[in-house]
Amino acid sequence: MNNIRNFAIIAHIDHGKSTLADRLIEECNGLEAREMINQILDSMDIERERGITIKAQTVKLNYTANDGNQYCLNLMDTPGHVDFSYEVSRSLAACEGSLLVVDSSQGVEAQTLANVYKAIDNNHEIIVVLNKVDLPAADPEKVKLQVEEVIGIDASESVLISAKTGLGIKDVLEAIVAKLPAPQGDVNAPLQAILVDSWYDTYLGVVILVRVKNGVLKKGMKIVMMSNNATYQIDNIGIFTPKKVMTGELSAGEVGFITASMKEVADCKVGDTITEEKRPCSEALPGFKEVHPVVFCSIFPHKTDDFKYLREALEKLHLNDASFTFEAETSNALGYGFRCGFLGMLHLEVIQERLEREFDLDLTATAPSVIYRVTTRSGEILNIHNPSDMPDPTKIEIVEEPWITATIMVPDQYLGEILSLCEERRGEQEDLSYIGNTTTALLRYKLPLSEVVFDFYDRLKSISKGYASLDWEISSYLVSQIDKLSFLINGEPVDALACIVHKSRAEKRGREICARLKDLIPRQQYKIAIQAAVGGKIIARETINPYRKDVTAKLYGGDVTRRMKLLEKQKKGKKRLHSIGNVNIPQNAFIQALKISD
């Protein structure tokens, strides 16, 4: 066990952690040269294209150090995006140390901070690795100072590398062997293992990634999940090199995978403790929590026939990612679809993109919303994320909305605009400080989640030319003035456009969407009224004027009553059309109307 090292790589998006993982695998001959592809551990196409890591991955490397000993290195590649921060915290709980990768041309960013603090909470030994030192803009000395001032860890012995060219990779491996502690654990104690991640494999069923803390996992053993007391029998045990290699057993300190004829990923919750049925351990490992969706939206297929394919696609994705939820719903305007819950906006985009790309579906997504807590006059408490479930305003006592604590790091020259963005989003400033003697400001804000889920992240990035970074966590529910904004077309409510908004925004939002619909809905033979309403009160209106056929064109001379008669006849015809005519709203009108403008 003294020759095992379990470590994670922590980095902000784009600081090069997946590339560093590639170089470490190459250096330890984990794969033959012909099998090597860039970002080998990012197994989904979408992970490679967006340059993000979504699922935590693991790989076991054998390394012969300069001292002549053979070491077994278990590398955990963790996601870097704020939506997946729980996956990060579980991966970190399975390790004893971390490599903190910082881009030496950009310096420390907000998500790096959040993940480093998680590593420190797990008592990790941290090795600072400064990447991209071959870039002209790299300034390792400045970044070392920044690491010491911002994070408060010693960076004097940082390893300087370029993951792209392979410079300094050997030094990283030597530092891992020399500085990181070996795992602690007792092979003879009752089994205690942490479930780090799980995914679905078409041949093996659910594959579970585990780190054994105490005891031994063996093939054929009966195991128990401590969160729900479900029991299973182990079919296969193995490790990733990063190819699957069956080993038959895993003992204390080791990381590997097991399969146990599970049908669904939802059965195994990330962070859960696994123990033996015959000889269970006395307590579960700390830090487990259920992950709940934060952002909700409805997804509808363009063709109604695709509904069953959409259900199958969602079920397949759910096999791999139990953190999003879905239930069927119907809409008068858009037909059959699903109400889905996600961990955040990136998670929503990734799932939607995977549905469209991997399953070839054309989809419409409604405006995202968050969970509001409504207390009715009768004292009932409802959790509501779908506008159609909102009770009548006369029955509501109070509505509470979720607030978050956001940490924003931003260069000084963009500070003013970022502050006004936060104020515009109803934010309350808690703290503003400068990092050491740099020109980077560290902001702490309390913001309503509903203002952040839309386009806050995009606006933050565009204002700061991509230099600002954001990390957030939900802090509390606060009483707020929330209204349901409905839209009527010729007096008929359109459920797909309804949304829940803050009172101060209702009128502006109503006007915006009405104006947009006016441009998008084609003209008819009769007048169309587009209205926005809160409760029973109309707060905005646009009118689409009808086409007018010139029925008097063929008249010339003659009596004026002939002219009047034709115009009267046209008027009656339009009136009849208006009473029986349905306004056909094209699908793209919904999609365009729901896009949030800056």
Swiss-Prot record:
Binding site for GTP: D14, H15, G16, K17, S18, T19, N131, K132, V133, D134
Membrane association type: Peripheral membrane protein
One example of a Gene Ontology biological process annotation: positive regulation of translation
Cellular component terms (Gene Ontology): plasma membrane
Enzyme class: hydrolase
Example GO molecular function: GTPase activity
Catalysed reactions, semicolon-separated: GTP + H2O = GDP + phosphate + H(+)
Subcellular location: Cell membrane
Family from the record: Belongs to the TRAFAC class translation factor GTPase superfamily. Classic translation factor GTPase family. LepA subfamily.
NCBIfam families (UniProt xref): lepA, small_GTP
HAMAP family from the UniProt entry: LepA (MF_00071)
Protein name per UniProt: Elongation factor 4
